[in-house]
């Protein structure tokens, strides 16, 4: 009887040991997977998909009228796809579109939005906040104290600017089709100030000797790569390559500066 109990106890101990090994192995595997995901390392299945689909051409809609990011076939967005092709062999059909028009629904799109919280399928590449500029050197501490001034904004930004600053009856907004028109209006003294995105317009600000008089950190543009919402290997490959590319690009920027 004692021998039987002893055997049963040994069996229970062995079962617990086996379960412990299985659980520990699962935790280790999960940690390795999470680490690989965080570093943009492709899984075996993803590598296999890439090898089998190198002849596949993936449609990507890409902004083509935004300085620095996508302009006449050059910029950050185009560099990303070129590096993606070079490193994986995947080919992309780059479908250009302009910011004033709707992009083709290709499933993969470089676009701009001003969301406070991005969706899971939107991969952030850069954030550019807005500034108020002027021909005169000054610092505005309180926007609400501006009196009897005309501010230039693009038509697409008017609602956003008004929502942020609220009602100020002494401020008049003149709207324009694009930033170039705003710059000309400011140079010709048709407006006192202008509100525009900062980084992509630095060349315009510096070349015209404009001054940044108010930094608007709560109004910004997100430059994102939007992928379709499906769970598949290609989407996973996109996300991991994005992680790898962003880390490399950041390190290259730090080294260069």
Listing of model-derived features with the role each one plays in the protein:
Residues 161-170, 179, 185-193, 197-211, ...:
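Extracytoplasmic/periplasmic ligand-binding sensor domains
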Residues 32-44, 75-87, 136-140, 144-158, ...:
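Extended ligand-binding regions for polar small-molecule ligands
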Residues 10-11, 38-118, 150-154, 164-188:
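Extracytoplasmic small-molecule ligand-binding "clamshell" domains
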Residues 61-65, 135, 228:
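Generic beta-structure capping elements
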Residues 20-31:
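Hydrophobic alpha-helical membrane-insertion segments, chiefly the h-region
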Residues 78, 82, 86-87, 91-145, ...:
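Acidic, polar ligand-binding/catalytic clefts
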Residues 3-19:
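N-terminal Sec-pathway targeting helices
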């Amino acid at each position: 009887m004692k021998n039987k109990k002893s055997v049963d106890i040994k069996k229970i101990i062995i079962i617990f040991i086996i379960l412990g090994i299985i659980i520990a192995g699962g935790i280790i595997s999960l940690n390795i997977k999470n680490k690989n995901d965080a570093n943009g390392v492709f899984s075996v299945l993803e590598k296999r998909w890439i090898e089998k689909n190198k002849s596949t051409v993936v449609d990507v809609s890409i902004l083509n009228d935004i300085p620095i990011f996508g302009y006449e076939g050059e910029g950050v967005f185009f560099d990303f796809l070129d590096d993606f092709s070079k490193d994986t062999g995947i080919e992309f059909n780059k479908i250009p579109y302009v910011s004033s028009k709707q992009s083709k629904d290709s499933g993969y799109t470089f676009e701009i939005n001003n969301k406070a919280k991005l969706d899971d399928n939107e991969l952030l590449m850069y954030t550019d906040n807005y500034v108020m500029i002027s021909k005169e050197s000054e610092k505005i501490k309180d926007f609400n104290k501006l009196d009897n001034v005309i501010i230039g904004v693009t038509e697409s930004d008017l609602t956003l600017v008004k929502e942020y600053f609220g009602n100020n009856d002494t401020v008049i907004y003149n709207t324009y089709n694009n930033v170039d028109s705003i710059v000309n209006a400011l140079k010709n003294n048709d407006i006192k100030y202008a509100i525009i995105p900062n980084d992509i317009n630095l060349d315009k600000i510096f070349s015209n000797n404009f001054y940044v008089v108010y930094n608007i950190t709560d109004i910004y543009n997100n430059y994102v790569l939007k992928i379709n919402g499906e769970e598949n290997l290609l989407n996973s490959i996109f996300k991991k390559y994005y992680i790898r590319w962003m880390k490399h690009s950041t390190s290259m920027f730090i080294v260069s500066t």
